[in-house]
A protein has these predicted regions:
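Sec/Tat signal peptide C-region and signal peptidase I cleavage site
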Residues: 31-37
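Bacterial N-terminal signal peptides that target proteins for export
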Residues: 3-22
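Short, glycine-/small- and polar/acidic-enriched structural segments
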Residues: 38-174, 179, 190-196, 212-213, ...
């Protein structure tokens, strides 16, 4: 038998082996690194809500700020966003306070990390002018369209309770905003509780009976927020901080000069391209919301302060009402764990 130690390898084979070793060395960082390229991709859910951050989605500034590939998916309601997040398809999503409360009460481990807007006058119950409804009592026997498990659904049920109207005395239909507009035009519904751009369409042939701002003053505030899958967020803290900073910058641009966001502005065009509606309605729609600053977000006024934060208190109060209405069966022992100021605080340190 030949002595293998003395056997010479052909030069061609040696060259091939060297190329393989070089290739493996180049691949090693990708295999071993916890944040390789395929990890820098995320799916984010947004809704048909008129907000400054929609412009940041449209112009790509969020991708630029985070260096992530972002798959943007549009949903018509927070309940649908919650379902997508429960499936794992979506890691970050826009969700109202009511569907968020329902989701975490049912075991979904989400964290609210940004208040997209304080709803104020931006959601309202509108009644058809032809429905002969001039006061709340006139709603008896009427049909109301509303997206179930949404902030407007929550306020619809609270409004009926406040007015002393038994929900059995009205017909409440589960409809998404686009369906509400179509049903309104057909005359199938007498009233609806919804947000823009659908709300703007209904106002053209209807009048406002009550707004979310009115009901918030009675102790039932609502807001639109952005939530993240807790585990995913904790594993991508750098992305989360940069995402929050990009959203805050978009809000700041609007706050500094709202007059630049006119019906003929590039911003209005970008918003309507992303979520529909008409550019003429954008300026008024934006003015109906309040957009908390980055400092306000991190404070107890919204996300900071643990159980004493405004957001945690709102979730707790909403959960009690949802249970009373039999929309959820159990209450979480502590709603503050579903609220975090950490990413807002980190964003404040970025330039």
């Amino acid at each position: 038998m030949q002595d293998l130690k003395r056997q010479k390898l052909p030069l061609r084979l040696i060259g091939s082996m060297q190329r393989v070793i070089v290739a493996l060395a180049a691949l090693a960082p990708l295999v071993l690194s916890p944040a390789h390229a395929e990890d820098k991709e995320v799916t984010i859910a947004y809704q048909q809500i008129v907000d400054p951050w929609v412009v940041a989605i449209a112009n790509g500034s969020i991708e630029k700020a985070t260096s992530y590939k972002i798959n943007w998916r549009q949903f018509e309601s927070g309940a649908k966003v919650a379902t997508a997040m429960a499936s794992g398809d979506v890691k970050v999503g826009v969700i109202g306070s009511s569907p968020l409360t329902a989701a975490v009460s049912q075991g979904l481990d989400l964290q609210l990390f940004w208040i997209l807007d304080n709803i104020n006058q931006a959601e309202a119950m509108v009644v058809r002018n032809a429905s002969n409804v001039s006061k709340p009592a006139d709603l008896k026997g009427k049909t109301i369209g509303v997206p179930f498990v949404s902030t407007t659904h929550y306020h619809t049920m609270f409004a009926l309770q406040h007015w002393g109207i038994d929900p059995k005395d009205v017909k409440i239909l589960n409809m998404q905003p686009n369906q509400i507009v179509a049903a309104w035009e057909r005359g199938d519904i007498d009233a609806a509780y919804v947000w823009n751009p659908a709300l703007a369409e209904l106002k053209k042939s209807g009048h406002v009976l009550v707004t979310s701002g009115d009901l918030s003053k009675l102790g039932k505030p609502t807001f639109d927020g952005i939530a993240v899958d807790r585990k995913w967020g904790e594993e991508h803290k750098d992305f989360m901080a940069k995402l929050v900073k990009a959203i805050a910058d978009a809000d700041d641009q609007y706050r500094r000069n709202p007059s630049q966001w006119s019906a003929t502005s590039p911003q209005a065009a970008a918003i309507t391209k992303m979520i529909g509606g008409t550019a003429a309605d954008v300026p008024e729609s934006l003015s109906l919301y309040a957009y908390p600053t980055l400092a306000e977000q991190a404070s107890p006024q919204w996300l900071g302060g643990g159980s004493s934060s405004r957001a945690a208190a709102a979730l707790k109060d909403t959960s009690a009402f949802l249970k009373e209405q039999k929309r959820i069966s159990e209450l979480a022992p502590d709603y503050s764990k579903f609220v975090t100021p950490a990413y807002a605080e980190a964003a404040m340190k970025l330039k």
